[in-house]
């Protein structure tokens, strides 16, 4: 495998933004997002289905169908509309999902008669291009190789933690999932 660089940028809300690239990323950051309160995702027992389901009240505050020019996953070059990535360019970016149904707070949420338990896990978003319309199918092989190396680095780091049993990568894309990358 070829060499990659990983920049660790600590955001104003203490979440880490990782920038991967073939060249070292040294760009100064632009405007950051406002700090949001951490949500308290948890599992709730569904007695009619006889299974645990995830619940995250914080998801109701997530960005929902903004115009493409205000995509929260694109480079944050517009100071009037900060994004998750406060840089004007990058190769691959990785950051924690602010609206995840899982987190590592390990607290049980008491909501009366509803059975709950912690929804332990870690959810990251990997943005594999600073171009809104890019897809993996259209990426050159060296960019795909960088993406695979990024996945490998994330696997290695996450699986070294005692609270992570497995890692499941998947791609969310499209209007049906309330995502703006179509």
Describe the residue ranges of each PLM region.
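HIT superfamily nucleotide-processing domains
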Residues: 1-180
